[in-house]
Amino acid sequence: MKKYFRFVVLLFLPVVCCLLTVATHAQNDSGLVKHKIAIFAPLYLDSAFDQSDEYRYAKNVFPKFINPGLEFYEGSQLALDSLNKDGVPLEIFVYDTRSAKETFEQQLAKPEIQDVSLIIAHCSNNEVRLLSETAARKKIPVINATVPNDAGTVGNPYFIILNPTLRTQCEGIYRYVQKYYSINHIIVFRRKGSADDAIKNLFDEYSKSTMATPLKLRYVDLNENFTGDQLANHLDSNRNNHCIAGSLDINFGRQLTLQLASISKSYPITVIGMPTWDGIKDFSKPEYKGIEIIYSTPFYNSKMDKVSQGISNHFSTKMYARPSDMVFRGYEVTWKFAKLLLKHSKDLASNLGSKQDKVFTDFDIQPVLNKKTLTLDYFENKKLYFLKWQDGIIKSVN
């Protein structure tokens, strides 16, 4: 706990010192044009610190709800530190979207936002629409780094979604199964309800538009307390069974995989899950051995490259902790799009799909067209990695 609290102190102090001021990462040469970037993240500073900047919680307590936004910010800060060492002309504004002093809408209306060239946001579903509207109204590229939601965005070439929408995820899973397992026995296990119906509808819709041979998907609705024996009634012991989890619910996915693993000695099974499975760590446990588990994710980092190792070493030596995936996300998004801004300046919106300045992820940013008007609605990352858990080991399979 002592080491972890030291991590808290080291991490929070820089945020407290710079949040309400403009952190300038630029050379003093007045001839340089300083590109301005606004970063929005849920830092919860007013929840963590009182008016005297004293930590509100006990020294051995660190609320988990603070982690994601703070870790994203820390990654962004590391990227900005690296850019600052290169003397790049950037001016950074950081906003705590959970501030008790001003609303998110008020932050977006601040005078300095009028002049920024790029907005990077670790946002929630409730904030996506405001970000999209701001991007369109001010003609500022906005990077939605976290939420797979377009909030009904139409006709907005300045809005970019890095975490693919459910439609993109379902189409990607369908194509993956179509490419590798089309001749096998394919069952979609699901629950009754509108959430799982949405996934079924997306599969069925893509099945009608695909240029390749459509998959023969068989849908099976499961009750709440289903067993391995009940699943076995829908499997074939003489064929490879590919079972798709037709639900985003993590508990359903975990239970489905566990029950399939329990009968895997009698049935050859591969289970294919949803992007929400990226947060399931149980798959490394012994009870999941014997079954092949595959799921999709837009963000994959093997952490074998020099940049990843440098970030890990920084956290280990300075903070006595391991960097989370959100730290790497913050670093990657800030570095890549800041570099693109420096190269393309006012023409950034036309170069958002550039493959240059890759850090960890092979982003494939493509225009999303309105099916009725065939005009551009927004940009979206279409890249999906497929990862496989087998006997406690995970690796990329595409």
Question: Model-predicted segments: where are they?
Answer:
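Short beta-strand elements in bilobed, periplasmic/extracellular small-molecule ligand-binding domains
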Residues: 84-99, 208-224
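Extracytoplasmic ligand/sensor domains, especially the bilobed periplasmic-binding protein
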Residues: 120-189, 193-203, 279-281
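Short, well-structured alpha-helical segments in soluble
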Residues: 101-117, 229-239
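Periplasmic-binding protein-like
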Residues: 112-124, 142-145, 185-191, 218, ...
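N-terminal extracellular/periplasmic Venus flytrap/periplasmic-binding protein-like
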Residues: 27-110
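Bacterial Sec-dependent N-terminal signal peptides
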Residues: 1-34, 188, 394-398
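Extracellular/periplasmic periplasmic-binding protein-like sensory domains
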Residues: 257-329
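Segments of small-molecule ligand-sensing domains
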Residues: 320-324, 338-394
